[in-house]
Amino acid sequence: MKTKILLLNFIIIFFLINVNLAIKKDSPFKEIQKNNNNKKENHDAINYYEDEDGFDVTIKDCISILVPYGKCTKIKSPFKKCPYKSIFISSNSTTPIIPNNNYNNNNNNKNKNNGSNQYIINLFENSKCYEKVNRNKNKIFKNFHEEKNYKESKKNELIINCKDKKLNKFNNNEIRVVCPISSKFDSSTSSISINTLAILSLLFLIFINKLIN
């Protein structure tokens, strides 16, 4: 009887650990790096943020899809409470969406982007989901934001208005949803750590052994 209970405990612990690892592997939330000591001057302007405390934050990973020419798309949000932070549209075309001179002047020639063929849309500035972006971005992308080439959906989907000439003039447009700052993640999506599982499992085993003895 004792052997069967111990074997059952082992199976339960093994199952919990594997479930936790699977959740972490499939999670859309990726770790971000803070680098306050070694600030980059030639960083990627799209994947670079400055958080509320003044730390430099580099986004490691984003959700990325390709939009075919002349077709609309819907992006489902991986975030339960906060639908979207921002997106940028990147074109494979040699014609830049952002003029080179405009981009470089606003960034004082520090953050040059080869081709400057990117456009960012900051979403929902008046909501809790809005994350302040790097200090130069609002100037660069202000006009595009005001044109409202997107709308919010009740189903947590971002609907791109593909009839807009800026989107349809390119053969392929890449739409990427920028991940939020880790501290702003929805706590309901976070998984239990392996250390916590190990401690709980150990306490459970001690409790079972006391019942047996």
Curated annotation (Swiss-Prot):
Tell me the residue ranges located in the Cytoplasmic compartment per UniProt: 213
Out of the domains of life, which is the source?
Eukaryota
Give a GO cellular-component term: membrane
- Where found in the cell? Membrane
The chain's Extracellular topological domains, given as residue ranges, are: 23-191
Question: According to the record, which residues are glycosylated?
Answer: 92, 114
Q: Which UniProt keywords apply?
A: Glycoprotein, Membrane, Signal, Transmembrane, Transmembrane helix
Protein name, entry field: Putative transmembrane protein DDB_G0267860
